[in-house]
Regions:
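Conserved N-terminal beta-strand and adjoining loop/helix that marks the start
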Residues: 1-20, 73
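Unchanged
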Residues: 37-131
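Short, flexible beta-strand-to-coil junctions
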Residues: 14-16, 24-29, 68-71
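Amphipathic, alpha-helical segments enriched in basic
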Residues: 22, 26, 50-52
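A short gly/proline-enriched turn/hairpin at secondary-structure junctions
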Residues: 31-35
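Short, well-ordered strand-loop elements centered on a beta-strand within folded domains, enriched
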Residues: 17-22, 85-87
């Protein structure tokens, strides 16, 4: 029985690994998009749903990793949105704004090492979601 309860989304542009999307949670600060799995929901489905709910962006799930987060999955998602320094407003009431990051924000909800471990992960070693 799989006991993982949540997903974290590493959303990258289609053609680069130099920028990623984070959301500024009103109570926790900057973090990767993500949230709890719903009953019967596959991790990649939850990742795409959470990404859309928190950022308004659609993407394509490319790979999944089970070992990066205790109790959760990290899903690599590629998005067709141009990298821009301008943040945008989320329709999720708990999210102040969403935006592209080129470096780890100071007011992050997670430790810098934890964020860096997700950014540095070698996705070639993870389970591919591509056919």
């Amino acid at each position: 029985m799989d006991d993982k309860q949540f997903v974290v989304v590493l959303a990258l542009p289609m053609d680069s690994d130099d920028a990623w999307i984070m959301v500024k949670n009103k109570s926790r600060g900057w973090e990767f998009p993500g949230g709890n799995l719903r009953t019967g929901e596959a991790p990649e489905e939850a990742a795409l749903r959470e990404l859309y709910e928190e950022t308004g962006i659609l993407g394509t799930a490319k790979a999944i990793e089970e070992s990066l987060m205790l109790g959760g999955y990290v899903v690599l998602v590629r998005v067709e949105r141009e990298v821009s320094p301008d943040p945008w407003i989320s329709s999720d009431d708990s999210i102040e704004e969403a935006g592209w990051c080129l470096q780890i924000p100071e007011s992050s909800a997670w430790g810098k090492e934890e964020i860096q471990s997700v950014l540095d992960h070698d996705w070639r070693t993870s389970s591919s979601l591509e056919s």
